[in-house]
Amino acid sequence: MAKVQILNMVVLDNPCPFHNPFQFEITFECIEDLPDDLEWKIIYVGSAESEEYDQVLDSVLVGPVPAGRHMFVFQADAPNSSLIPESDAVGVTVVLITCTYRGQEFIRVGYYVNNEYSDPELRENPPLKPHFGQLQRNILASNPRVTRFHINWECASEAKMEDIENVDPASNAMLPPNCAPSKGLAAALNPIPENSMDCM
């Protein structure tokens, strides 16, 4: 069972100009004390065609985390527009908020993001070269996609002892569960986890 549950995530300052920071108010609960840090990341998917355009907008370590309910506002600068392919600047993309513990991602929250010109004339006749200063970002806050992954919450020595106690003497090796989600718009929101995905 996961030792951390996200209870709520609120998208702040939405909609807003493209260059405004991303802001998420995150409420989560720990069912017991965590001795190590949680690492939270905000990732902007720059193109559905290739994950090479993904930008980690910010990463923050939170911890050690005592048992109980916690809330913080996670803010990250807008993506570097020069790293976004011109053909992907306007339209729908994805922003991801991920959390890892001891290097293992255990939850991913994805939101669709629509970037469009606020000026109706620019919407009708978009320029060949995107004008990021004229774009408005609108996050579909009402429909986040939440994907959870099984991880090992114990430290290596505890996990090793547990494996030794639970190993089948006839087997040669324990194969830990592994889940390496792929990227892209649909893939970023719908990786193939080994347990569950739902809407918040």
Swiss-Prot record:
Subcellular location(s) of the protein: Nucleus
InterPro entries the record matches: ASF1-like, ASF1-like_sf
Gene Ontology biological-process annotations: chromatin organization
Keyword Cell wall biogenesis/degradation listed: no
Assigned keywords, A-Z: Chaperone, Chromatin regulator, Nucleus, Transcription, Transcription regulation
GO CC terms of this entry: nucleus
Family annotation (Gene3D superfamilies): Histone chaperone ASF1-like
Pfam families on file: ASF1_hist_chap
Signal peptide boundaries: none
Residue pairs linked by disulfide bridges in the UniProt entry: none
Principal location: nucleus
Name of the protein this chain belongs to: Histone chaperone asf1b
Organism: Xenopus tropicalis (Western clawed frog)
